[in-house]
């Protein structure tokens, strides 16, 4: 939902009323429906992005339009059905991102004439449609907020790509700003620590180990200069210092690998399996790279990896929720946005 925070009116050189500032929260994406058709549309858009799959040659296109889009959508649809928000008929990521947008609008209501909206890089609501909506409402300045604490070309950069692609079709473009990654922001680290501590206090057991699981990516992308791995490590180290834990008690792993290439290691699922086989009975997993709970946290971690842990001898497993639209999570986003809006409001 678009939320407008009103103040006075002004006029642009073209004569239209344009004094508003747009803030667009952007997350990765979600299918419109939890079925094979919905997943096929979503995955085709996602996996056709050269920022996500860099080798977009003939071999990849044949594989994508052949085996992948004829098999993977059915499997992923079953996973989405396990976590689907049936009341609103949408994925949890969409529900949470909308809530983040609404709460941000309320939190910055005293800071001028701002329009807060939200979009998905893949799927709906699209960045194209929401940027058009913001400019139609008179926004001549636009702050794009990629909801990724750690930068990667496959996430933050493709948000920028799409924003400039949309602006490239406009004659009268809004002025554009993009928020930076916030992987080591003290407010973000503190919010993570408080969230973890509160969750652990609610459990009936004390985890022997906490695992910080981040979305993985091909090792080749890091070798080309992507800073993602270093930023994940920096987040984890800052969190260790904040919580007084060493690397044996707060472990860094990477999940969601896809395909046959080597991805960032250690792999989350393999580490979960090894810990259980080595005698660890109580494990908690936090996912600091996700600003909102989604398929990768609610199904892959909370269900798949919990089953791996128990199947191999583990007993107690808990997936720690993302910051989502919690007060501490929203405070991180609010401060980030207000910092980048300086001079505009």
Curated annotation (Swiss-Prot):
A GO molecular-function annotation: metal ion binding
Keyword presence, Iron: yes
UniProt binding sites for Fe cation: 215, 296
Localization annotation: Cytoplasm
Reactions the enzyme catalyzes: heme b + 2 H(+) = protoporphyrin IX + Fe(2+)
Gene Ontology, cellular component aspect: cytoplasm
Keywords: Cytoplasm, Heme biosynthesis, Iron, Lyase, Metal-binding, Porphyrin biosynthesis
Record-linked InterPro entries: Ferrochelatase, Ferrochelatase_AS, Ferrochelatase_C, Ferrochelatase_N
Coiled-coil regions, chain positions: none
Example GO BP: heme biosynthetic process
Listed pathway(s): Porphyrin-containing compound metabolism; protoheme biosynthesis; protoheme from protoporphyrin-IX: step 1/1
Domain of life: Bacteria
EC number(s) given by UniProt: 4.98.1.1
Entry keyword annotation includes Magnesium: no
UniProt xrefs under Pfam families: Ferrochelatase
Family: Belongs to the ferrochelatase family.
Function of the protein: Catalyzes the ferrous insertion into protoporphyrin IX.
Protein name per the record: Ferrochelatase
Originating species: Nitrobacter hamburgensis (strain DSM 10229 / NCIMB 13809 / X14)
Lineage: Bacteria, Pseudomonadati, Pseudomonadota, Alphaproteobacteria, Hyphomicrobiales
